[in-house]
Regions:
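A short, N-terminal "cap"/entry segment at the start of jelly-roll beta-barrel domains
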Residues: 1-32, 73-77, 83, 119-136
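Short, well-ordered beta-strand segments in beta-rich or mixed alpha/beta enzyme
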Residues: 60, 78-81, 106-110
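Extracellular/periplasmic catalytic domains that process cell-envelope and extracellular macromolecules
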Residues: 25-28, 51, 58, 75, ...
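Glycine- and acidic-residue-biased ligand/ion/polar-headgroup-sensing regions
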Residues: 51-71, 80
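Short, solvent-exposed loop/turn elements at domain surfaces
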Residues: 44-47, 67, 115-119
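Ligand-binding loop in jelly-roll beta-barrel domains
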Residues: 71-73, 86-116
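Conserved short histidine dyad/triad with adjacent acidic residue
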Residues: 32-50, 72-77, 85-90
Length: 136
Protein backbone atom coordinates (compact mmCIF):
# COMPACT_ATOMS: atom_id res chain seq x y z
CA UNK A 1 0.00 0.00 0.00
CA UNK A 2 1.42 3.38 -0.98
CA UNK A 3 0.84 6.23 1.45
CA UNK A 4 -0.27 9.59 0.07
CA UNK A 5 2.03 12.48 1.01
CA UNK A 6 0.54 15.11 -1.30
CA UNK A 7 -0.68 17.16 1.65
CA UNK A 8 2.90 18.02 2.58
CA UNK A 9 5.69 19.89 0.89
CA UNK A 10 7.58 16.65 0.48
CA UNK A 11 7.00 14.33 -2.45
CA UNK A 12 8.36 11.43 -0.41
CA UNK A 13 6.33 8.25 -0.15
CA UNK A 14 6.01 5.41 2.32
CA UNK A 15 5.43 1.95 0.89
CA UNK A 16 4.34 -0.83 3.24
CA UNK A 17 6.43 -3.88 2.35
CA UNK A 18 4.86 -6.34 4.75
CA UNK A 19 2.27 -6.32 7.45
CA UNK A 20 2.10 -9.10 10.03
CA UNK A 21 -0.24 -9.84 12.91
CA UNK A 22 1.73 -9.21 16.06
CA UNK A 23 3.71 -12.37 16.83
CA UNK A 24 4.65 -13.26 20.37
CA UNK A 25 7.52 -11.08 21.55
CA UNK A 26 9.30 -12.41 24.63
CA UNK A 27 9.51 -10.37 27.80
CA UNK A 28 12.84 -8.53 28.20
CA UNK A 29 13.61 -8.95 24.49
CA UNK A 30 15.95 -6.57 22.76
CA UNK A 31 16.09 -5.94 19.03
CA UNK A 32 19.10 -6.60 16.81
CA UNK A 33 19.43 -5.72 13.12
CA UNK A 34 22.06 -7.60 11.12
CA UNK A 35 23.30 -7.54 7.53
CA UNK A 36 23.84 -11.01 6.06
CA UNK A 37 25.90 -11.53 2.90
CA UNK A 38 26.10 -14.89 1.11
CA UNK A 39 28.63 -15.36 -1.70
CA UNK A 40 27.47 -16.95 -4.98
CA UNK A 41 26.16 -20.47 -4.42
CA UNK A 42 26.49 -20.33 -0.62
CA UNK A 43 24.32 -22.80 1.30
CA UNK A 44 23.58 -20.25 4.02
CA UNK A 45 23.28 -21.20 7.67
CA UNK A 46 22.39 -24.75 8.69
CA UNK A 47 18.87 -25.44 10.01
CA UNK A 48 18.26 -23.29 13.07
CA UNK A 49 15.72 -21.52 15.25
CA UNK A 50 15.39 -17.95 16.40
CA UNK A 51 14.99 -18.61 20.15
CA UNK A 52 14.31 -14.98 21.06
CA UNK A 53 11.35 -14.40 18.82
CA UNK A 54 10.46 -13.53 15.25
CA UNK A 55 12.80 -12.20 12.58
CA UNK A 56 11.82 -9.68 9.92
CA UNK A 57 13.91 -9.37 6.76
CA UNK A 58 14.38 -7.42 3.56
CA UNK A 59 16.29 -8.64 0.51
CA UNK A 60 18.82 -6.08 -0.70
CA UNK A 61 20.54 -7.93 -3.55
CA UNK A 62 20.35 -11.25 -5.33
CA UNK A 63 18.06 -14.18 -4.60
CA UNK A 64 17.63 -16.39 -1.55
CA UNK A 65 16.06 -19.84 -1.29
CA UNK A 66 14.05 -19.49 1.93
CA UNK A 67 12.32 -22.29 3.81
CA UNK A 68 10.53 -22.38 7.16
CA UNK A 69 9.02 -25.39 8.88
CA UNK A 70 5.45 -25.92 7.67
CA UNK A 71 5.92 -23.82 4.51
CA UNK A 72 7.10 -24.72 1.01
CA UNK A 73 10.54 -23.39 0.00
CA UNK A 74 10.34 -20.15 -1.96
CA UNK A 75 12.71 -17.81 -3.76
CA UNK A 76 13.01 -14.27 -2.41
CA UNK A 77 14.45 -11.55 -4.64
CA UNK A 78 15.89 -8.09 -4.09
CA UNK A 79 13.08 -5.85 -2.80
CA UNK A 80 11.14 -8.68 -1.12
CA UNK A 81 10.22 -8.45 2.56
CA UNK A 82 9.89 -11.63 4.62
CA UNK A 83 9.55 -12.85 8.17
CA UNK A 84 9.74 -16.01 10.21
CA UNK A 85 8.40 -17.02 13.58
CA UNK A 86 10.81 -17.48 16.41
CA UNK A 87 10.73 -20.05 19.17
CA UNK A 88 10.21 -23.66 18.11
CA UNK A 89 9.89 -23.12 14.32
CA UNK A 90 12.82 -24.50 12.30
CA UNK A 91 14.35 -22.24 9.65
CA UNK A 92 15.60 -24.82 7.12
CA UNK A 93 17.12 -22.74 4.33
CA UNK A 94 18.46 -19.28 3.65
CA UNK A 95 20.74 -20.23 0.74
CA UNK A 96 21.92 -18.03 -2.08
CA UNK A 97 19.74 -19.22 -4.95
CA UNK A 98 22.27 -18.09 -7.56
CA UNK A 99 25.77 -19.31 -8.36
CA UNK A 100 26.76 -16.21 -10.32
CA UNK A 101 25.99 -13.34 -7.92
CA UNK A 102 26.03 -12.78 -4.14
CA UNK A 103 22.88 -12.15 -2.14
CA UNK A 104 22.42 -9.91 0.86
CA UNK A 105 19.59 -9.16 3.24
CA UNK A 106 18.89 -7.24 6.41
CA UNK A 107 17.32 -9.17 9.29
CA UNK A 108 15.82 -7.61 12.41
CA UNK A 109 15.53 -10.09 15.27
CA UNK A 110 14.06 -10.12 18.72
CA UNK A 111 16.65 -11.56 21.10
CA UNK A 112 16.52 -12.62 24.72
CA UNK A 113 19.50 -11.76 26.95
CA UNK A 114 21.63 -14.83 27.59
CA UNK A 115 20.35 -16.74 24.55
CA UNK A 116 22.09 -16.99 21.18
CA UNK A 117 20.75 -15.11 18.17
CA UNK A 118 20.49 -18.44 16.29
CA UNK A 119 20.24 -21.94 17.72
CA UNK A 120 21.30 -24.85 15.48
CA UNK A 121 18.99 -27.85 15.15
CA UNK A 122 20.50 -31.34 15.57
CA UNK A 123 20.31 -34.06 12.91
CA UNK A 124 18.27 -36.17 15.34
CA UNK A 125 15.66 -33.46 15.75
CA UNK A 126 15.50 -32.87 11.99
CA UNK A 127 14.74 -36.58 11.57
CA UNK A 128 12.07 -36.48 14.31
CA UNK A 129 10.33 -33.48 12.73
CA UNK A 130 10.69 -34.40 9.05
CA UNK A 131 6.91 -34.82 8.77
CA UNK A 132 6.48 -31.08 9.43
CA UNK A 133 8.60 -30.13 6.42
CA UNK A 134 6.79 -29.11 3.22
CA UNK A 135 8.77 -30.15 0.15
CA UNK A 136 6.82 -28.54 -2.68
Amino acid sequence: MLQDTTDSESKSTIEVLQEVRSPLIPENAHVMTVLINHPPGAAGYPPHRLPGGPGFGYMIDGEMLFELEGEAPRVLRAGDAFWGLGGDVIHYQNANNRTDIPCSFVLTLFCVPGQPMLERVTEEELEERKGLRVTS
